[in-house]
Amino acid sequence: MSGSLDYCLDQISKSAESISTLYFKPPGIFRNAIVPGNSKVYSDLIVKLIRDGDSIEEMSLYSTDNDGNMKRKDGKVGIYDHLLEREATLKRNRALCLPDPRPITYIPKGFYLSQNDHVIRKKQKPARDFIFEGSNSDELGIYDVLLKKFSKDEQIKQFLHALRNGSVITGEDVSRRKTLFVEDFPISIILSVFREIIDQWPLTEYKEKFEKLMQIYNGLQADINELQKKVEIQELDFQHEALPEKTSISSLIDKEEKEIQKLEKQLDLLEGRNK
């Protein structure tokens, strides 16, 4: 056991001597580790190996204040310096019977979410159509009217929240939540809300815009239906194209069987004549 320890110490000494020939950048704002036990011969080498620095260069970087604390001459400070200063401040305040600094205050998550929604609303561009144009829709109580009208329809309520806030978080009662935007909702929900707007605020301008949107929607829906019919026709054609192969094989089998039966009859006739 002692032999292996001596071997390890010898290897460390050789490594330390080898590393000592290299130049290392002076230490930063952290404090390097120091191994006690200077009475032993190898302790200086271990300290030098761990510190990775020249003591002369280190002394040129640091200076001591009146309290004996080490500080960098270039004025840079780190976490260690902050903790030392904080500890000294706490001791001084307690000696003077002053209250301790306030602890870290926990802010509820809902506050952050509401702040985020507020920032999103401020950054949004007023590019919405119908009665949602401008920033006075909340003042007019439009969303309150629509939310009351669709109070039993959860999807439309989520759509209205997304329309007002830019997005809505769903599934808050489960572990996995999902953020939905206005474009994530079905077209049928959007049209239902727009129809209700036309009924509640029957203005000519809104009706004209709604009719234009309905024309575009109906045109796109007709194109989609036509493409779906073409796809169905192509699928049927493909199925019918595959059927003739099966029918042709079965017809060939029937033809061969009939040919075999015909030959068997001819063979029977020949055998009868030979008898």
Curated annotation (Swiss-Prot):
It holds the Pfam family DASH_Spc34. InterPro entries: Spc34 (IPR013966). One of its GO terms (cellular component) is spindle microtubule. GO terms for biological process: attachment of spindle microtubules to kinetochore; cell division; mitotic sister chromatid biorientation; protein transport along microtubule to mitotic spindle pole body. It is found in: Nucleus; Cytoplasm, Cytoskeleton, Spindle; Chromosome, Centromere, Kinetochore. Keywords: Cell cycle, Cell division, Centromere, Chromosome, Chromosome partition, Coiled coil, Cytoplasm, Cytoskeleton, Kinetochore, Microtubule, Mitosis, Nucleus. Residues 203-275 form a coiled coil. It comes from the Eukaryota. Belongs to the DASH complex SPC34 family. Component of the DASH complex consisting of ASK1, DAD1, DAD2, DAD3, DAD4, DAM1, DUO1, HSK3, SPC19 and SPC34, with a stoichiometry of one copy of each subunit per complex. Multiple DASH complexes oligomerize to form a ring that encircles spindle microtubules and organizes the rod-like NDC80 complexes of the outer kinetochore. DASH complex oligomerization strengthens microtubule attachments. On cytoplasmic microtubules, DASH complexes appear to form patches instead of rings. Component of the DASH complex that connects microtubules with kinetochores and couples microtubule depolymerisation to chromosome movement; it is involved in retrieving kinetochores to the spindle poles before their re-orientation on the spindle in early mitosis and allows microtubule depolymerization to pull chromosomes apart and resist detachment during anaphase. This is DASH complex subunit SPC34. The gene is SPC34.
